[in-house]
UniProtKB/Swiss-Prot annotation:
Listed SUPFAM superfamilies: HLH, helix-loop-helix DNA-binding domain, PYP-like sensor domain (PAS domain)
Keyword Endoplasmic reticulum: no
Subunit annotation: Efficient DNA binding requires dimerization with another bHLH protein. Heterodimer; forms a heterodimer with ARNT, ARNT2.
Protein name in UniProt: Single-minded homolog 1
Gene3D superfamilies: Helix-loop-helix DNA-binding domain, PAS domain
Species of origin: Pan paniscus
Domain bHLH: residue ranges: 1-53
Amino acid sequence: MKEKSKNAARTRREKENSEFYELAKLLPLPSAITSQLDKASIIRLTTSYLKMRVVFPEGLGEAWGHSSWTSPLDNVGRELGSHLLQTLDGFIFVVAPDGKIMYISETASVHLGLSQVELTGNSIYEYIHPADHDEMTAVLTAHQPYHSHFVQEYEIERSFFLRMKCVLAKRNAGLTCGGYKVIHCSGYLKIRQYSLDMSPFDGCYQNVGLVAVGHSLPPSAVTEIKLHSNMFMFRASLDMKLIFLDSRVAELTGYEPQDLIEKTLYHHVHGCDTFHLRCAHHLLLVKGQVTTKYYRFLAKHGGWVWVQSYATIVHNSRSSRPHCIVSVNYVLTDTEYKGLQLSLDQISASKPAFSYTSSSTPTMTDNRKGAKSRLSSSKSKSRTSPYPQYSGFHTERSESDHDSQWGGSPLTDTASPQLLDPADRPGSQHDASCAYRQFSDRSSLCYGFALDHSRLVEERHFHTQACEGGRCEAGRYFLGTPQAGREPWWGSRAALPLTKASPESREAYENSMPHIASVHRIHGRGHWDEDSVVSSPDPGSASESGDRYRTEQYQSSPHEPSKIETLIRATQQMIKEEENRLQLRKAPSDQLASINGAGKKHSLCFANYQQPPPTGEICHGSALANTSPCDHIQQREGKMLSPHENDYDNSPTALSRISSPNSDRISKSSLILAKDYLHSDISSHQTAGDHPTVSPNCFGSHRQYLDKHAYTLTGYALEHLYDSETIRNYSLGCNGSHFDVTSHLRMQPDPAQGHKGTSVIITNGS
């Protein structure tokens, strides 16, 4: 009975051994290795192999245990893979999320002295430095994926340095510190996603494992490394201050060794790469060896070269303390962007030749020359800006206004529309409308504030062949809804520049094109309607009561076609008529009265000033037409007006109908509003006979509203908006309402760019 049990146990062990032997033969290992394996190693390797099939389900051949016919090409592929591993100067390894090594190539024994069988199936934490355990855990940790759940599989790149155990002899191990060798690992973390059947838009992801290649860094004995033509070596202190440089640095970077000694490496590295270099420097001090990322080393004559460095800390042989840093640097490219100076140590070349500049790409200098040539050939054309700008906030003057036949506003910027040449005018050759360069859609000019969609659809204005676009657009531009039972009082200011001549000279006002600088509105007896006045200069802003617009009060302004060919002539005639009126207005200051009816004196609009330009932009001109002050007081304060005198079909006065009257025709009641944009002192603009403390305040109690609600509008050239014949016809159709044109002074805020200019205030008095 005892003998029988012994035989049964022996048979069982033999069967078990035979099964393990058959299992070992199925492993993708040479038979010489599998025949020497024990049972524990066979189980460890088998489990690792099964895990590998999960990572690479199609990369390990046929199904488990199935023998397949191998073609000669398959044998060539295996041999090629073996040769690639030998020439890789490294080893390949695959690590599971728990740290188990699922696979490692046999070349690991060359770098670490540890066999493939010994490492496979064991935890990688057993073979790395304890200080690197946390880093390895972070590498193997996968964060919440940001990819779409429809993506089944993706990779996350990983690059890190590990100190792995090395059991090689010192003569073959290279640099080791405490039995550990620095290995540069680079690879990717493989993530696989699965969708749930019950929730197709939700899913889960699986961290399959890490696939990486380990490279052994150059040994510390740098004298054994052959320096090729694209390599140079330097020795530096622990803070990267250069101590010694190879003479090849002069051929590769242009710097002589003595130019770089006693300077840190950071001093000659591109500013965008200093962070990566700092991280590599930190790893070097911690682990002893490092491979930097590609960084840009500045060349002496401008530009840079791309460099990658292999740095090693050399220890003192006696004290075993870190002594210095030795780095082998590989210059990967020629000098790029020659002539581009990024450091004071660089010497700019006599003729900068950027590598990215081609014959078809103009340089900045060529662009400037081309702009100057275009400016000299056509002074009347404006240089447009890619972004919409507003003349009320940009005080620079357009280059096209310096010598333009129309002059221009002192506040005209490069984006303000100017009169185009006939060849460049949009539409037909007879179309003299303004070119709205900064606006793609003209409807945004007509309806610049909050309107109902029905208003935009039902009463959208369409330009006809005989319609001047500039007149239509300016005439339909409004700032609010006139309220019933109150007197709408519309006004517009247009700035005219002063030429280099004296303000009193007649030539100072020749050929000047007015531009509307701002549009404002007053309702009632000198009271501002805050619900309808736009307070923000932003082009997309609207008043707070934008939802209270009543579309029935807004009808299209009456329009009568005029002769386009006589627009410029009419404008010049208007300016000449204005000059005649200005000559009549040159009277003693006692003939002027304040708007409030008090006996305050007002500074003359055109006087010789001997003081420097003011610091703020001032719009003065609180003047009356040639009517008595009592008439104005009766009309505005006494309310001696017909209740329907200003009710012109409850529609705002079209700016396209506003024009200067003849010199013999004076407005019956026009109150001119003045606005101090920057609250400048008015005393500097007074003559000797005026009181120094008097300021032309119009409705002083409401001056805060003037400062708050002034809205700046650019882009409407008045020569497109009227001719004298049209205004006469329109004024007769508006119950005999008259129009008045007066002038006031306009100063430039910037002393460097300051130049005097006049502006025309056009008001519709009622």
